[in-house]
Regions:
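A short, N-terminal "cap"/entry segment at the start of jelly-roll beta-barrel domains
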Residues: 2-71, 162, 168-263, 349-352, ...
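Short, low-complexity cationic-aromatic patches
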Residues: 63-67, 80, 89-91, 135, ...
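Conserved short histidine dyad/triad with adjacent acidic residue
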Residues: 54-60, 73-92, 249-255, 268-283
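Short peripheral tails and domain-boundary helices/loops at the edges of structured domains
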Residues: 150-163, 340-355
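Conserved hydrophobic/aromatic beta-strand scaffold that supports enzyme active sites
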Residues: 55, 72-76, 98, 114, ...
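A structural feature that tracks compact, well-ordered secondary-structure segments
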Residues: 73-75, 267-271, 280, 296-298, ...
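Ligand-binding loop in jelly-roll beta-barrel domains
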Residues: 127-154, 261, 308-309, 317-343
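A short beta-strand-loop-beta hairpin characteristic of the jelly-roll/cupin
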Residues: 82-87, 92-119, 129, 277, ...
C-alpha cells in the first residue's frame, strides 16, 4: 500500500528510462567519441607495421577509430604472384570497395572480366563480385583500399567469402549459380519464383498502390544485380580531370553521379599547388585522406596536423578542416567519403568556410 498521493513506478520503468536517456544523450557522447578518435597516422608508423606483413589496417573501428562507414588499409604482395595466393576466384564481400594502386602493374579479374592496371589507377569493385589481383611487375604491388565494411558489419549484413576458407562460405558452396550471382541468396529458389513468381499476375492488382510497392520490392534484386554489372570499374590515373571548386582543384573519381554503382562511398583526388591552401568546410559524413604527394599541414577544428607523402588523416564527422601546402611540389590527396550514404538517408549537410586560394 502506498502513501496518499504517491505513485508506484510501472514494472521496468527504470530500464525504459535508462534506454531513453541513452538516446537523449547519444549526440553529446558521440561528440566525445569523435574527439578521442585518432586523426593522424604518420607514414613512419605505417611503414613500421607494414614491414613483414602483406596488409595493415589504417582506419577501422576495431583499432580505436570512431569510423562507422569506412575501413581503410594498405596492402601488398610480391612480384609474379597473386594476392593471398588466390588461384581461381579470390574473394567477394557485401561491401563497396575502391582500390588505388601505389606501386606495380598487373591485372585484376573482377566478376570474370580482366582489368589491367598500373600505379595511379583506381578499381571500384562491385558489391559481392569475386575478384583477385595478379602482380606482373618486378617489384611489390602495393595499394591502399577503402571499403564500407564497418557499415555492413554494423547492420549485420556483412558477408565475406574467400576461396581459401570455404568452411565459412554462406552461399558460394551451394551451386555454380550461387557463385556467379552478385546478390546473396538470389538464386536459392527456382527461376520461376524469382522476382515476381509466375503464378502471380500483376494485372490482377491494377490500381493497388500497395501491390505496386510490393512488386517493386520483388523486382529489386534483379535490377540491382544488373546495375552492379553495368557500373564503371576501372579509372586510369592519366584520365583524371582536375577542376576548380570553392575547395580548390578536385578530380572526382568514384561517385554515383558519374556512372558508378555505389550507394555509400565516394572517392576523389584533391590537388593543392605549392604555397596554396584548400578551402575550409565541414560535413556530416566520414572522410579519410591519404597523402599521395607533397607536404604541408591541416587545421582540423583547432588542431594542427603536419603531414607528408604516405600519411593518412581520418577527419572526424562535422569537423572543420582545411589543408595547406608548404612544400615545393603540388600536394595530391586521395579522399574517400561516406557522402552518398548520408545523401541516401537524408542526413547530408556540408557547410563552406574560407574559399581556396
Amino acid at each position: 500500500m502506498t502513501e496518499k498521493g504517491s505513485q508506484t513506478k510501472p514494472s521496468g520503468y527504470d530500464d525504459y528510462l535508462r534506454m531513453y536517456m541513452e538516446m537523449v544523450s547519444f549526440a553529446k557522447e558521440e561528440l566525445k567519441r569523435r574527439e578521442k578518435s585518432p586523426v593522424h597516422i604518420p607514414r613512419e608508423k605505417i611503414d613500421r607495421e607494414f614491414a613483414g606483413h602483406n596488409w595493415v589496417l589504417l582506419v577501422d573501428p576495431r583499432i580505436g577509430f570512431n569510423s562507422r562507414i569506412i575501413r581503410f588499409w594498405i596492402n601488398g604482395f610480391p612480384p609474379g604472384e597473386e594476392e593471398n595466393q588466390w588461384k581461381s576466384m579470390g574473394h567477394r564481400h557485401t561491401v563497396e570497395a575502391v582500390i588505388y594502386v601505389l606501386k606495380g602493374h598487373g591485372y585484376s579479374i573482377i566478376d570474370g572480366i580482366r582489368y589491367d592496371w598500373e600505379a595511379g589507377d583506381f578499381l571500384c569493385v562491385p558489391v559481392f563480385a569475386w575478384h583477385r589481383h595478379i602482380n606482373l611487375s618486378d617489384e611489390d604491388m602495393v595499394y591502399v583500399a577503402s571499403t564500407t565494411g564497418p557499415l555492413s558489419m554494423g547492420i549485420g549484413v556483412a558477408i565475406y567469402e574467400d576461396e581459401r576458407y570455404p568452411e565459412y562460405w554462406v552461399f558460394a558452396q551451394k551451386d555454380t549459380a550461387e557463385k556467379k550471382s552478385l546478390i546473396p541468396g538470389a538464386v536459392e529458389i527456382p527461376d520461376v519464383q524469382r522476382g515476381i513468381p509466375q503464378e502471380i499476375n500483376p494485372a490482377q492488382y491494377d490500381g493497388s498502390t500497395a501491390a505496386k510497392l510490393y512488386f517493386d520490392q520483388l523486382r529489386f534484386a534483379e535490377g540491382e544485380e544488373e546495375a552492379r554489372r553495368k557500373g564503371k570499374v576501372l579509372v586510369k590515373g592519366k584520365d583524371l580531370k582536375f577542376e576548380k571548386t570553392p575547395m580548390g582543384w578536385v578530380a572526382p573519381v568514384v561517385d554515383p553521379k558519374l556512372g558508378f554503382h555505389v550507394k555509400v562511398m565516394s572517392t576523389l583526388v584533391a590537388r593543392i599547388e605549392p604555397g596554396k591552401r584548400s578551402g575550409a568546410h565541414r560535413h556530416l559524413y566520414e572522410e579519410v585522406n591519404h597523402i599521395l604527394s607533397g607536404e604541408g599541414y591541416s587545421i582540423i577544428e583547432d588542431k594542427r596536423y603536419e603531414w607528408k607523402k604516405g600519411d593518412t588523416l581520418a577527419i572526424p564527422v562535422f569537423s572543420w578542416h582545411q589543408h595547406f601546402n608548404r612544400g615545393k611540389e603540388p600536394a595530391r590527396i586521395l579522399v574517400h567519403t561516406g557522402r552518398p550514404a548520408m545523401e541516401n538517408i537524408g542526413l547530408m549537410i556540408t557547410q563552406q568556410g574560407e574559399v581556396a586560394d
